[in-house]
Amino acid sequence: AYRLLENEQMPGWLFMPKNGANTVWESWEGTAAQGGIASLNHYSKGAVCEWLFGTMCGINVAGENRFTIAPRPGGHFEFAEASYDSVYGKISVRWDKTDGGYKYKISVPSNCKADVILPDGRKQTVGAGEYEL
């Protein structure tokens, strides 16, 4: 998934902006698509946004006022950050690549809990507050 995200050649997510796109194209080829131009503002591949939130940064709604945080760093990224404005408040996650691995910053809104699952296998449930792991 990270290779596809970082790929500047077709098919790859960076191919589109590298070739002038500011939206998601229906066809990987954009204006050079066989049979003529397809939609240049299409949601067909928009699921990458869910992947950025739910996998790369690991934010998932687990139920009423409960979240699962399970980030999966990778690729050549030095950091990633995402937040979700729930009806209970903002939950946010940031990870940074360090010399020794990764550092995680997590913020859980009031009256909520989060099950944190890190790639190294560490698991813990946390309440509202700010955490560095």
Spans of model-derived segments:
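Non-catalytic C-terminal accessory modules of carbohydrate-active enzymes
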Residues: Y2-L133
